[in-house]
Amino acid sequence: MTISDKIRIYELSRDLNLENKDILDAAQKLSISVKSHSSSISSEEAKKIKNLINKKNPDKTILSINKPSIKKDNFKQNKEDKSPVLSSKQGKPLKNNSNKKPLLIKPLNKPESVKKISNQLQNPNKPNIVNSSQSRANLTNTNSKPSQNFNQDKKTFVNNTPPPIKSPAKPPIQLIAKPKNINNNVKSSESSQNIARAEDKRRLSSKPDQNTNKPKTKNFNNRKNTPELVGAPIRREDPIINPNKQNNNKQNIAFKQTASNRPGSPNRPGMPNRPGLRNKPSDQGRPGSFNRQGNPNRPGSPNRPGMPNRPGLRNKPSDQGRPGSFNRQGNPNRPGSPNGPGMPNNRPGSKFNGQNSSGIRKPVSPNELLQLQKNNNSEKDKIGIKNNSKQNIEVPKQKAKAPNNRPNATPSSKKPPHRTFSNSSKKPGKTDWDDSAKLEALRSKNTQKQRQKVHIIGENDDSLTSETSGYSGEKISILSASLARPKKGKSDESKSQKTIKQFKKKKKETTRQRQKRRAMELKAAKEAKQVRPEMIIVPEDNLTVQELADKLSLESSEIIKSLFFKGITATVTQSLDLATIETVAEEFGVPVLQDDIQEAAEKTVDMIESEDIDNLIRRPPVITVMGHVDHGKTSLLDSIRESRIASGEAGGITQHIGAYQVEFEHESQKKKLTFLDTPGHEAFTAMRARGTKVTDVAVLVVAADDGCRPQTLEAISHARAAKVPIVVAINKIDKEGASPERVKQELSEKDLIAEDWGGDTVMVPVSAIKKQNIDKLLEMILLVSDVEDLQANPDRFAKGTVIEAHLDKAKGPVATLLVQNGTLKSGDVLAAGSVLGKIRAMVDEHGNRIKEAGPSFPVEALGFSEVPTAGDEFEVYPDEKTARAIVGERATDARATKLAQQMASRRVSLSSLSTQANDGELKELNLILKADVQGSVEAILGSLEQLPKNEVQVRVLLSAPGEITETDIDLAAASGSVIVGFNTSLASGAKRAADANDVDIREYEVIYKLLEDIQLAMEGLLEPDLVEESLGQAEVRATFSVGKGAIAGCYIQTGKLQRNCSLRVIRSEKVIFEGNLDSLKRVKDDVKEVNTGFECGVGCDKFSSWVEGDVIEAFKFVTKKRTLSQ
């Protein structure tokens, strides 16, 4: 009882010495809301429950409402109600039962539980009971002889015990309590059959006398108080022969004993107890039940002969004469199953069953029998008493023919007893022992179709399993009929298991396994197509090794092997040139065809389309000025601009962009010319790499006093790659020592032959400073452009090229655009390469804002999403959706192109080095070499060639004998080169120019020193290596679990440990983990480092499997200067 006047169900049951279910049943009848034995109720509700239980059980002699025990009042009412019915309807005296001799079987050992219960009995006159068989025999004798008392019955049992049962061949008796000696339960079938025959004769010749007198009831009640009396009730009417001979399994068992074996007797010859099952009491003396004379299936007694024990199930009492059921002795029909031949409907809910089902009680387990058996006159029992009059008439008919079938009913003799489902004694949905009896009925109907063995471990199953492995395992698969469901097929289970296994297997597939599987699939696919192609087409004159292998239907390893034998080391991603591809393909017998593609320098998109033909007009030419740095290119451009701009604007000219437009009067007509300042400008190089054709005419400026220089030759190659006409301007003709003819001679060696020499190249001698022949040069440019027939359509969406682009802090991405066709207007949506833009503003070369720009007009435009790439082509689209789609496709192509460039052949050339160096993908050292004599230059160049060039390339821009001049300074400043002088001097003004342009000049007199410094400079361009430096070593001496991880308690043996350093865990001389030291603590404080001789805690986020004895090696990575590798 709690402080708050609340009491729990289990406390109340303990106070009343009842079970929890008794209290719960009483609470349900009183409509008190309780859920389980731990529910709390008020003290008033507890009083109501006590009053209800006291009314039902004034003497409190019954333990449980649902327990099958013998009750005083009920037995009295049975005799009062049933005696007239039996005597009137049967017309046979009940005293004939006195002729039967009782059968007494002495138990081997008296269980201690009986002793304990006997001390608690309410009847003090009978404290010592020899065994349960005596009590039951006494009870039987009392029913048959009303004039005798209990002591006389006891003596009669002892004296009248038949000798066949006392024979040593008979099995020991099993008491109500849990059996101790299991092995003695085995019986012989012959002895049980002899007993059955003897019993049959006695039973058929005698008619049981029903008790009608009160004294008999008193004697019975006195005997009832013993715990052994909890058993099947005794039939109190004469058995009537039942024509149904097939369903008498229980009756056969009953007639194997003499009439002296009465209910309550534990002696059951030839019948072992079921292991793991509780012996259920029989219904002897219950209201509404008959006295089953001669039925050996009693609570606590050995079960039927020849019937193995059932593991996991309690022994059920026999159901003969129970209310709601016939005397089903050996009847295989079970509730809920089809009835046997000649049997009425036994199913729950049937008419007959409904009439006789109210007096059934649940069986009692051995543990429950150890407590006091208390009277409980429940409503269920009262209902059973009222229905007994009808039961007494029909039930005996089931007993008559039992003895004839018992010896031969071997299969049916193994059928366990069953009970009819009782609606009044058990609530629907509750699992009871009756449910398992229903299953027994279902299985016994078709014995050949038995369920699979399922051994259910019971309370008493520990030592009985070996004795009862036969019947129980074969017959029982589940305990409750309410839980019975068809078993899932093995095939379905196996399929589902396989599916789960496959699914888990896929989940556990590692990256390496997946790669291996894909490689195997690819190999199988390639093996399936081993047919060589007739020919392969090589686009863009290059293919990677993998692409070539795919085209030849070979493995990439075959291509690499072929290249290796040719002295070429390649990888699957390395690009191969056309010559190498042809060599490899011919080895495998496949010809190579070059794809009909325009050369790289030509434009990939034609600016003039077929729709523009009707609206074409002449457009101004685009002129590119190229040449060496010191050959007067800038002076020439300045002269052209100054001569064609009004004198009022001359002083305020500021070139904002790399392209500008000038007007020139030719043949009384004003002509516009667009000049592109490309020499030294990165835009021209980017456009050549992109393969675009921007310029219409290339002007090559060559100094008359210096002749052709390396950059002059490079400019010639640029113009030829772009396939544009070249106009040569021989500058500085006014300077002393100028020789235009020598320049023509040098150019003729490069296949540029002047017109006056019979060639087709226009060469004009000019002087930018003196402004000589400037007009003639412009006229030649116009003549050449007229021959080219340059046209465009201004009435269409604009197309053009990005000259240059940069990111402005205030304006954002800014691009210089050259319109080549159409008209560009503000608000147009355009795609420049892989960049989307919408024109927000445009300005010309003078900084004036304009709204539109026609063909060959350079403008500076704003409104791009990001900075476009110089050399990309742009095009205006009608809507943003279309432009965005085009941009996405170009972005994909751009990535592929960049990848191809990265995987290009590693053969080093001047142009490829320049391109990669500009992109920051290659370390490059630019040099300008000047020496005293040509022999020194050649020697130095030969030594530089021997330096390692795998990681850093040496590019000598200029190597010549002579002194270091200002021209060399200018070249070094433009290219970011270092000037190296060997036994030479500086020209006048060179030192000043070098300081002004911040150019590094190195002078040497010994070649070895020169080579050493150059090698050190090359190594300085290399990124330093990360080298492992050891910090210390610690040993794990303890581990601590913290949350999901673990902390290692360590002792620093050498060096020190630092937080966030790298560590390596070594166990059994093997490295099991390598990562970072994330947590370092000294006692409870976070520390940065712990030195030798101290203890600390080490934690790693990605490792927690610490084991005592692990060794932790701490280290860190430091940078180390790299050296050149061969």
From Swiss-Prot:
It holds the Pfam family IF2_N. One of its GO terms (molecular function) is translation initiation factor activity. Residues 116-151, 181-195, 254-264 have a biased composition (Polar residues). Residues 652-656 are annotated as: G2. Residues 627-634 are annotated as: G1. Residues 731-734 are annotated as: G4. Residues 63-519 are annotated as: Disordered. One of its GO terms (cellular component) is cytosol. Residues 70-83, 429-443 have a biased composition (Basic and acidic residues). Residues 161-171 have a biased composition (Pro residues). Residues 618-790 form the tr-type G domain. It comes from the Bacteria. Keywords: Cytoplasm, GTP-binding, Initiation factor, Nucleotide-binding, Protein biosynthesis. It is found in: Cytoplasm. Residues 93-111, 211-224, 240-252, 291-315, 327-349 have a biased composition (Low complexity). GTP binds at residues 627-634, 677-681, 731-734. Residues 677-680 are annotated as: G3. Residues 767-769 are annotated as: G5. Residues 501-517 have a biased composition (Basic residues). One of the essential components for the initiation of protein synthesis. Protects formylmethionyl-tRNA from spontaneous hydrolysis and promotes its binding to the 30S ribosomal subunits. Also involved in the hydrolysis of GTP during the formation of the 70S ribosomal complex. HAMAP family: IF_2_B (MF_00100_B). PANTHER family: TR-TYPE G DOMAIN-CONTAINING PROTEIN (PTHR43381:SF5), TRANSLATION INITIATION FACTOR IF-2-RELATED (PTHR43381). This is Translation initiation factor IF-2. The gene is infB.
